């Protein structure tokens, strides 16, 4: 037989609530949307999926077309993505195929430079350029979406500058 257990009744006191909150250790993805859009516009990529696949392949070092296709399965569908990235020099053939081995590909120097630049901006090591010469988002003839992105970039750079002036106590 199962013994009966009395439930302990607790009353809530609204005036004595204790709130606990943990501050996250990392916040470098906070501005990912701004940096992602900046990279797509600046480097002339067709979509976010192109950027995502290049970032995946960058960490893979050498890859085959099969590996590219496997990772492309859960991205937006684009039949010509591989050939377009190859044609636009984002990836290149590292080893040509022979009778026993398939082609091996690698992200090109152009792609590696872009991804390194994105990582530096995410980590706060360098700001996003605000000059018209280095960033076509700041052109006077830019569309409205570019102008709203320009405002977000200015705010991001301002926040980055303030963070460098007052480093966080956890990093000392």
Q: What spans do the regions from the language model cover?
A:
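Eukaryotic partner-binding/assembly regions in large regulatory complexes
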Residues: 1-17, 161-172
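Short alpha-helical segments that sit at the start of domains
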Residues: 20-53
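Short, cationic-aromatic polyanion-contact patches
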Residues: 42-47, 96-120
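Short amphipathic alpha-helical elements of helix-turn-helix/winged-helix folds
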Residues: 52-60, 114
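Short acidic, hydrophobic short linear motifs in intrinsically disordered regions
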Residues: 59-72
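Short amphipathic alpha-helical interaction segments
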Residues: 73-87
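A short, conserved structural fragment
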Residues: 86-99
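Short, amphipathic alpha-helical interaction segments positioned at domain boundaries
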Residues: 109-144
